[in-house]
């Protein structure tokens, strides 16, 4: 405002010295000086708007300086994460989010072995619980973000006789994730609760061979993560497979959902996220990592998750 006042007074003084029109209300009101004042005002307003835009803040009022945040996320989050990152960068353009996607068990092991990571977004609570027990997470940053459902799928155009878990033994081949992979663990849980597999203290320890035997010796393609299962079925390499419902997003013309497995067979398929205790991260990186985890709980993020077939009704 001070700059604006000085500019207007200077304009008025110049107008008087040139014997132009008289002043009004203590300022020069000639059309020429008014036009110039309006131009100055518009320029000032534009400058202030640009300044305000560059200072656009998050909920806690902070815009971060340039920093990079590494996110380890379950393979089933690959597609939705691209949209989440894009949305987050609308308010935090200086934060570069780098995603690394694999099975939650593999990512957990990498964190335990000292891999540089700022945020862990798991497809199951088990891996998050283990890291929390090892004090590898920042206290108070863990949140349950979304729920998902296991599906039995086949490729579009297949003549499979399989309708769901109950008759998986009719398949010529099955793509199935290893028990250490959340979707593989949930599938085994469902098969136990459906009476197809025998009960076990730790269902994730049930081997692929044991699953095959319980299904009458059907051929099983053991996959390292849910993405590999999705690809194997979509490409027709295996007749059926078990994936998450969210994994069918964008593949509606290639995958056919035979059964959405009910929660009473699998239990809730909760995806938790938390900030990792990364000793290599500076203060800005740590603050941005925490902020991104909080963003994942926002209404904006929830809308994106729902578009990708995730359930946002979680406790």
How should these model regions be labeled?
Residues 23-26, 32, 36-38, 42-86, ...:
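Exported/periplasmic ABC-transporter solute-binding proteins
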Residues 99-109, 116-132:
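Ligand-binding clamshell of periplasmic/extracellular solute-binding protein-like
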Residues 1-10:
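Positively charged n-region of N-terminal signal peptides that target proteins for export
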Residues 94, 116-117, 238:
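Short, high-confidence coil segments that cap the C-terminus of an alpha-helix
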